[in-house]
């Protein structure tokens, strides 16, 4: 089951992005401090009271273009209605109710979606009734005053969000099928890949949308293995506004990634890695999913004996944070290497669930330390006492040390590479945590 989506909606300058950043500060799933992972997201994972959900910021409106503001606020409100389980409608308690607020509210009242009216920029909580009274005329039952900038009352807001989220459902109704998200920018060939696989194999369930808001799932069987292909292609609403289109496409993609076991990240061979590719791949990496990089339209590329290797180097240069992900070169149109791709995604999904025995793990770590001792920092030396694996999907390891502050990023990367050399983890991200031994 995909995580529920909570959309932040409102006119410009009411503090949507500030609220987004405040709520995103509670997330625990993002690995901080890793280089080359694009961070300019419009979405983030949040975990609060044992519930996980995705928050989305519907910002990006030019405040100087009045026509664009009017159209974009409407369009973003409509997208929130389509996509979200819950909507945070943000208004400005300092400046009061405006005609644009009423326009957005009119959209939201017509929907069947749950709405929390968030009155931001409340300075005096003792007299908050005076700051908020006029907003009750908008007709929403739930109203919460906050100061996103200072974090006041945001805990109460998170409590109410969790209270209003839909109940948890089963994680997966097809336990023996591998959920594979096929992601990539528009027109990279996602639908062509699904159509080729479906056309070649026996279709069990084809093109059945989970809901009108979800990606299309196609369940196929190949050589005794079942694959649930999650395709976001063809679902993106057409819009003349580029920013809104990218927002809609990104939200579809992250929902597909979130409920997958593994990800096929498709790259256009004729265009190479783009900035949009980096953003999409970055979320898959941060979400801890097994991943394969599939370079599509390879049949259209002029090749010599070095073309494939040179292309791999270029991909890893642009996606430095995905150097663990295998690269394969396919043609979704002709089917070249598509069967190999299916075997590869199954392999990396298995790698992402791999566990290592504690004794063997510590042998490898100690050998790595002997080969390259940790560098000293400010005259102090890092000591690693022992290591244990604490999780899978992705494989997560805790190193008990004398002082976590002495761990240099370069040495952390060295330890990760040592684990990969010893145990593989092909196509799987690895999480390393360092805790002080008590």
Swiss-Prot record:
Positions of GTP 2 binding: 184-191, 231-235, 296-299
Residues annotated for GTP 1 binding in this entry: 10-17, 57-61, 120-123
Role played: GTPase that plays an essential role in the late steps of ribosome biogenesis.
Keywords: GTP-binding, Nucleotide-binding, Repeat, Ribosome biogenesis
All copies of domain EngA-type G, residue ranges: 4-169, 178-353
Alphabetical list of SUPFAM superfamilies matching this protein: P-loop containing nucleoside triphosphate hydrolases
PANTHER family on file: GTPASE DER
Isomerase among keywords: no
Protein name per the record: GTPase Der
Gene3D superfamilies noted in UniProt: 3.30.300.20, P-loop containing nucleotide triphosphate hydrolases
Organism from which the protein derives: Halothermothrix orenii (strain H 168 / OCM 544 / DSM 9562)
């Amino acid at each position: 089951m995909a995580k529920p989506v909570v959309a932040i909606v409102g006119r410009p300058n009411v503090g949507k992005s500030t609220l987004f950043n405040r709520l995103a500060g509670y997330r625990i799933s993002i690995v901080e401090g890793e280089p080359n992972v694009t961070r300019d997201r419009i979405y983030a994972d949040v975990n609060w009271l044992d519930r996980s959900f995705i928050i989305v910021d519907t910002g990006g409106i030019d405040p100087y273009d009045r026509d664009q503001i009017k159209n974009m606020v409407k369009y973003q409100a409509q997208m929130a209605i389509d996509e979200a389980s819950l909507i945070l409608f943000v208004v400005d308690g300092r400046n009061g109710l405006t005609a644009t607020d009423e326009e957005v509210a009119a959209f939201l009242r017509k929907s069947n979606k749950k709405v929390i009216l968030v009155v931001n920029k409340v300075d005096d909580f003792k007299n908050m009734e005076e700051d908020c009274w006029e907003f009750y005329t908008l007709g929403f039952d739930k109203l919460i005053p906050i100061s996103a900038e200072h974090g006041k009352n945001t805990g109460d807001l998170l409590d109410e969000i969790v209270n209003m989220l839909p109940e948890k459902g089963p994680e997966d109704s097809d336990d023996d099928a591998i959920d594979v998200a096929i992601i990539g920018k528009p027109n990279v060939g996602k639908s062509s890949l699904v159509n080729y696989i479906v056309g070649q194999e026996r279709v069990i369930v084809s093109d059945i949308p989970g809901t009108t808001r979800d990606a299309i799932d196609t369940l196929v069987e190949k050589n005794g293995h079942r694959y649930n292909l999650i395709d976001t292609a063809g679902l993106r609403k057409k819009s003349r506004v580029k920013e809104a289109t990218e927002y809609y496409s990104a939200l579809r993609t992250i929902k597909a990634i979130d409920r997958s076991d593994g990800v096929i990240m498709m790259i256009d061979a004729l265009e190479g890695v783009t900035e949009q590719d980096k953003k999409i791949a970055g979320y898959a990496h941060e979400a801890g999913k097994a991943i394969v990089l599939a370079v599509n339209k390879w049949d259209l590329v002029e090749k010599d004996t070095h073309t494939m290797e040179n292309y791999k180097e270029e991909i890893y240069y642009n996606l430095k944070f995905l150097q663990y992900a295998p690269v394969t070169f396919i043609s979704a149109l002709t089917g070249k290497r598509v069967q190999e791709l299916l075997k590869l995604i199954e392999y990396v999904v298995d790698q992402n669930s791999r566990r290592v025995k504690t004794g063997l793990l510590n042998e490898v770590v100690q050998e790595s330390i002997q080969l390259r001792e940790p560098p000293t920092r400010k005259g102090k030396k890092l000591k690693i006492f022992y290591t244990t694996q604490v999780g899978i999907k992705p494989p997560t390891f805790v190193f008990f040390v004398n002082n976590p502050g002495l761990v240099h990023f370069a040495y952390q990367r060295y330890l990760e590479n040592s684990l990969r050399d010893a145990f593989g983890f092909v196509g799987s991200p690895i999480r390393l945590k360092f805790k002080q031994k008590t």
